[in-house]
Amino acid sequence: MPSTLIHDVQKELKDLPARGIVDFLIQYFFEDINWINQIVHPPRLLAQYENWWKMDTITRVADLEFAVLMLRICAYASHFLPSKKYTVDTIKGRPLSDIRSNCDRLAGRLEGICNAAVLRGSLVRVQYMAFTAMCYECDSRIKLSWDTLCCAIREAQEVGLHREPPMRGDDGMDDLEREMRRRMFCNLRLAKALDRVPFLVDAYCTVSLPQMHLHPTIANLQAPDLFTERVLQAQLVRFWKKLEAVNGPPGARPYDPVIAEERYQRFCNEFLPELPAPFALEPNTDWDQHIPELPRQRELFHVALFESVMHNFRQLLRLDQHHLRSLPNSRMALVTQHRHTLATAAMGLFQSVTSLHAMMSFNQTKLSLVIFYHFEMAVVLSLCIIRACDSNGMQDLEHINFFSPHSPLSSNMIDISQSQCLRTIKEARRQLEMMSLGSVMAETGARQLGILVDHVQATLARSGTQTRSMPSTETLTYNSSSSTSYGDGHAHGVSSELPFTFQQQEGPTANAFRTDSNVFEGLMLWDLSTDALPLDPSFLGLEQLHEISELQPNMGL
């Protein structure tokens, strides 16, 4: 670096938090938080961390970039405190909010010096930009988080993370750095929160998927690596994209139950059986005692699996009754079965996200996926109930005998009766209300679910089914070992995540909420006082929920 910039760096570093505070936050990050995304490699970063503190003067841009990364990690970790294990809101007598602000401000100033010294970035620069985006998300500054994530993606392309590096060459990279480049790009491509259609075709990206093990040996090939969950998500995403290549993704055309069924059966018969046993819906838990993060990663993976199944069938909630009545019996039977599968997937999603919620030792309200999936599951179940209780009294089970009620999503009986679905929706609302003390987004979701619950109950009352328990045929028994009329019965349900793209979900979400500050309480676009329920609610997106949560404080509500 030029001598003038070196002087500026030394001046700025005088504002660095005390070593004891930084040590605490770095240690806490690796113990309780890094398992979620695994953007950095703990052994290498900790070795660099020790060496960095031994430097008298920072003269290299690489060392300055590492300082920014260190500060961004500290700021991110501070969002998840206090926790169950650390219940006070200070570190070494200094308030957490003060430490977080200190780290954010100093990192921003040092980042400016990095950009002035060298325009072209590095893997470390992409990493600290990703942590910056995650910090903004924790603060509910979602648009700024998306903008920063876009910048990280652009920076990743500038430094070639989307291209497979040569195995041997003069690039100065070792095998570990090559693998971390793959992992970083994998995380960026799994960043669903953008809710944007990808603008780069797959052929543009030649980088391989990350390895399951950084240093595979005969002894550890059967043990899941900490990054296995991320790799499996990427594999599932590629699988769904392959299925969608023929007829397009859900939402690209009107819902076709035959196409949706073909996708689902290929998913059940080709993808699920190949998943590692520790991540199955009926998992082998032998490794749990050796890998403490594994149970949480498994639930995170299961959340992704159920969401991907919901993604495949969610469009059926947009079918109007006139169109349904025009379908031949065979297709109507498929729609009926798909509605049951959608409800089952929503129930599975709720179970997984609830388990994940209970396993977390930190402040869960800072992890937006916990809030959002409580909300999304409840919306989908609500619409399943409403669609099944149309005003003309058409019953879901009119054509149920066309198919055997078995599914690889679960080997156990899952109650998807209207009464159980309604209880689940109310429980999701209750949990959101509990989380609302620390999250505007959770508060907004709980309030909107309250409106929706009232509408569901009114619909059930009008249809005369509010207190009716479904017959035994409506409480479906699912058995992964049973054959079905449209599957081979050999799937061993396991989970994964959404398409390998920068989007939350397909479908028209732009108008799902109104943004007029005078009608904030009526932000949802459907009329809750009538039987006519427009179709947009089935595509309530993360973007819209975030927009509402950002509107509230700005409107003084």
From Swiss-Prot:
Region described as Fungal transcription factor domain: spans on this chain: 26-186
Entry keywords, A to Z: Nucleus, Transcription, Transcription regulation
An example Gene Ontology CC term for this record: nucleus
Superkingdom of the source species: Eukaryota
Start and end residues of each stretch annotated as Disordered: 463-490
GO-annotated biological processes: DNA-templated transcription
UniProt cross-references to Pfam families, sorted A to Z: Fungal_trans
Compositionally biased intervals (Low complexity): 472-485
Subcellular location, record wording: Nucleus
Main location: nucleus
Function recorded in the entry: Probable transcription factor that regulates the expression of the gene cluster that mediates the biosynthesis of the phytotoxin solanapyrone, a causal agent of early blight disease of potato and tomato.
Name of the molecule in the record: Probable transcription factor sol4
Naturally occurring in which organism (per UniProt): Alternaria solani
Gene: sol4
